[in-house]
Regions:
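Phosphate-handling DNA/RNA-contact segment within nucleic-acid enzymes
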Residues: 1-4, 22, 43-179, 183, ...
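A charged alpha-helical hairpin associated with nucleic-acid processing machineries
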Residues: 91-92, 133-140, 167-183, 187-405
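Non-catalytic interaction/clamp surfaces of large macromolecular machines
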Residues: 1-35
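Substrate-binding/catalytic subdomain of NAD(P)-dependent oxidoreductase enzymes
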Residues: 39, 51, 288-291
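Short, well-structured alpha-helical segments
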Residues: 21, 34, 50, 299, ...
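Short alpha-helical scaffolding segments that buttress acidic/His motifs in well-ordered protein cores
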Residues: 1-4, 8, 24, 38, ...
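A generic alpha-helix surface/boundary motif
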Residues: 17-22, 47, 146, 269, ...
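Helix N-cap / loop-to-helix initiation motif
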Residues: 30-31, 59, 298, 367
Length: 405
């Protein structure tokens, strides 16, 4: 991997790599940033890296295990990455363990990652952590993509990291906990980014991390925000990051009509469920006061509701449905979950179906967070060369989740 990274970096600075260099330069990256992250390029010819490494003395079996090549019966070993800007992925100790590639032009898939190997496990690593771990800033920033991390580091926010093409895992959250007690979540401001943030928050809080969410609106991502507003404005957004519990409650507003008395009542019941989940009484009381003040309800009324729901256990088992939406019966929910589970089984057993299904179904269509996460992993593995059920199972450390998977 180290030799491959050197090769890609060299290629970026040749005439063949001009397209890749122009792309990175067009995204505002300096030569120093390109060097710091070891960015490179793999050109349109699909065997240059293979020939380079063969000349270095590597045999085919080692190259096959590296994840850098695809074996073709007709053409032999072909480079996995071609016509792409290359992002070397390093572990916390700065060892190159894999690569990400962004296609030049309109080819598919737009982004391609190394498959999992003996040294590369996406669920246990974070892009940019080898640099962020040395930051003097008190927290870490978790964002979505390579360019988000790179642009933030270039702008001076050198505490940014990103998950590697998958939803944030508990192992990645635990990895961040080694270096900080607080994480700022900066995902894209679109609907997909909001859903990703809501899935990440429990992972982060589950390992004891204080978690806040940064508002990027009206811009989509950190790179776009910094380009338009500058570093000082971005720093201000970091300082104003919203407490994750209040963010979760605010996001629930979208499902209710707060101008309607019944809608507001249903929303507040849903907010109460979130407050019930807070075990520490002092912490819960602080949130009670904040929610009561924001939504104009007496603290004692809210406290009484939380107490009643906590005693009944309803906060853990029931969901208030938004007004004017169809209420699904348990039998119907069970049928939907069974159908989705069957779909995941088909996708795992017959990966060739995935290419056809993608036109009609995306991971976001799965209604339960666990099934949605599994679907994302299956599709990612498919685009990286093959679906491996054993590796899917290993992504889940929770025994109940493993049993369900």
């Amino acid at each position: 991997n180290k030799q491959a990274a050197k090769f890609y970096y060299y290629q970026l600075h040749t005439e063949r790599g001009k397209q890749g260099y122009d792309y990175l330069n067009g995204r505002g990256l300096s030569d120093d940033t390109i060097r710091k992250f070891g960015l490179g390029y793999s050109d349109k010819y699909g065997s240059l890296l293979y020939r380079f490494l063969k000349e270095k003395g590597y045999d085919d079996e080692i190259l096959r295990q590296s994840g850098l090549f695809l074996a073709d019966e007709v053409h032999g070993m072909q480079d996995k990455f071609w016509n792409r800007v290359i992002y070397p992925i390093m572990d916390a100790n700065s060892r190159v363990i894999g690569f990400g590639g962004r296609v030049m032009g309109d080819g598919k898939p737009k982004y391609l990652n190394s498959p999992e190997t003996k040294i590369f496990d996406k669920s246990r690593n974070l892009y940019g952590l080898h640099l962020a771990r040395s930051s003097r800033r008190k927290n870490l920033i978790i964002c979505e993509g390579y360019m988000d991390v790179i642009s933030m580091h270039q702008a001076g926010f050198n505490n940014a990291v990103a998950s590697l093409g998958t939803a944030l895992t508990s192992l990645q959250a635990g990895l961040m906990k080694r270096y900080t007690d607080e994480v700022l979540v900066i995902y894209d401001s679109d609907e997909a980014g909001v859903k990703a943030a809501l899935r990440a928050i429990p992972m982060l809080k589950g390992v004891g991390l204080t978690t806040r969410v940064v508002n990027l609106r009206p811009y989509k991502d950190p790179d776009e925000f910094i380009q338009h507003e500058g570093c000082e404005a971005f720093e201000k957004r970091l300082e104003e990051a919203e407490n994750s519990v209040l963010y979760e409650i605010r996001m629930k507003e979208r499902d209710f009509d707060l101008a309607d008395p019944q809608g507001k009542s249903d929303f507040l019941h849903e907010a109460v469920r979130r407050l019930v989940a807070i075990e520490d009484e002092i912490e819960r009381n602080s949130y009670l006061e904040a929610v009561a003040g924001k939504y104009g309800i007496a603290v004692e009324v809210l406290r009484k509701q939380v107490g009643q729901m906590a005693l009944s256990g309803a906060g853990r088992t029931e969901r208030v449905k938004p007004r004017n939406t169809a209420a699904n019966k348990k039998e119907k929910e069970g049928g939907v979950e069974k159908a989705q589970k069957l779909m995941l089984t088909w996708m795992t057993s017959y990966p060739a179906l995935i290419g056809k299904l993608e036109k009609y179904i995306t991971p976001e269509d799965f209604t339960t967070p666990l099934y949605r996460q599994i679907a994302e992993m299956i599709v990612l593995q498919y685009h990286e060369g093959g679906v491996n059920p054993a590796k899917l199972l290993n992504q889940f450390v929770d025994s109940e989740e493993q049993k369900e998977v």
